[in-house]
Amino acid sequence: MNKYTASVVGGSGFTGGELLRLLTQHPYFEVVQATSRSKTHKTIGNVHPNLRSVDLRFTDPSELESVDILFAATPHGVSMQQIESFTAAADTVVDLSADFRLNSAEQYDEWYDGHACPEYLEDAEYALPEINRSNLVGASLIASGGCNATATILGLKPLFDADILTGDEQVVVDVKVGSSEGGAGGGDASSHPERSGVVRPYAPTGHRHEAEIEQFLGLSVSFTAHAVEMTRGASATCHVFPSEPVSNSDLWGAYHDVYAEEPFMRTVAGGGGVYRYPEPKSVAGSNYAEVGFERDPENHRLVIFSAIDNMMKGSAGQAVHAANIALGIDETTGLEFTGLHPVGAP
């Protein structure tokens, strides 16, 4: 079996570790390089204890090898500075940061601090495979969607496809996220004594993932993010106010039409048992996303739920999913793990 050679730039962070976990078990990828400025020459297992069996050491990112595909798991701002060296080293580049998710330099001026290489934005394909799979086939520069944006878009998109929403309605989104979203260098707010027991609003307004949601869905959302005491996970609760009454069968039909054939989507709405709605714990460690809904006819409101593992469906898993599609590999390859139950705090 011919394998694609792969490198992971920024392999010492949480997301880099998830990429290495997935890629070293993937039958069509051979990881030949993982880079880290801070962990150069250390073994992969020294940094990621679950990968102690991986016989590879971190190298300096200035020493990129030529590979078939390069995954960049670097903080925002790094990939845009290094994109020329990335594209010179690899035929396909998958970037997990926000550096190529938006379409224009003007958007980066508004939401970030500008863009160092705006000429690359036109060629970048935003990766949310359930929604824009065809755009990823053969793509050479892929921008993996942000975790909060992914959860929100997956929850809301079927309502647009079914004309339940048009883009003129009020949409309020409340996302609760785990500490791993802050990365391995998350700072004081992510340390255990400060994080333990909290439900902390950290982006009441102006969260940068709003830009991805608005770009993809074509509507303005009122978005608030809370940090909560879990390690993995993003749980989005979306309150929408459609102009016309919506029945339960309308909702089931909308979500069935979009997601029934999707290998990593599960619709969970009511029913019996403990897990009656989407919950991050149910998808921890997997590339699955769960979506669900509840009607509130008295207040002309729909409550839409979405749950993902922020480091998998919201990052590394989505990146590998997109890479599979780009290279013509069966898209579920290397991503079949369904999660664990029971499991402790994710």
Swiss-Prot record:
Its EC number is 1.2.1.103, 1.2.1.106. Its main location: cytoplasm. CDD domains: AGPR_1_C_LysY (cd23939), AGPR_1_N_LysY (cd24151). It catalyses: [amino-group carrier protein]-C-terminal-N-(1-carboxy-5-oxopentan-1-yl)-L-glutamine + phosphate + NADP(+) = [amino-group carrier protein]-C-terminal-N-(1-carboxy-5-phosphooxy-5-oxopentan-1-yl)-L-glutamine + NADPH + H(+); [amino-group carrier protein]-C-terminal-gamma-(L-glutamyl-5-semialdehyde)-L-glutamate + phosphate + NADP(+) = [amino-group carrier protein]-C-terminal-gamma-(5-phospho-L-glutamyl)-L-glutamate + NADPH + H(+). GO terms for cellular component: cytoplasm. SMART domains: Semialdhyde_dh. It is found in: Cytoplasm. Pathway: Amino-acid biosynthesis; L-lysine biosynthesis via AAA pathway; L-lysine from L-alpha-aminoadipate (Thermus route): step 3/5; Amino-acid biosynthesis; L-arginine biosynthesis. Keywords: Amino-acid biosynthesis, Arginine biosynthesis, Cytoplasm, Lysine biosynthesis, NADP, Oxidoreductase. Pfam families: Semialdhyde_dh, Semialdhyde_dhC_1. The keyword NADP applies. The keyword Oxidoreductase applies. Coiled coil: none annotated. Belongs to the NAGSA dehydrogenase family. Type 1 subfamily. LysY sub-subfamily. This is Putative [LysW]-L-2-aminoadipate/[LysW]-L-glutamate phosphate reductase. It comes from Haloquadratum walsbyi (strain DSM 16790 / HBSQ001). The gene is lysY.
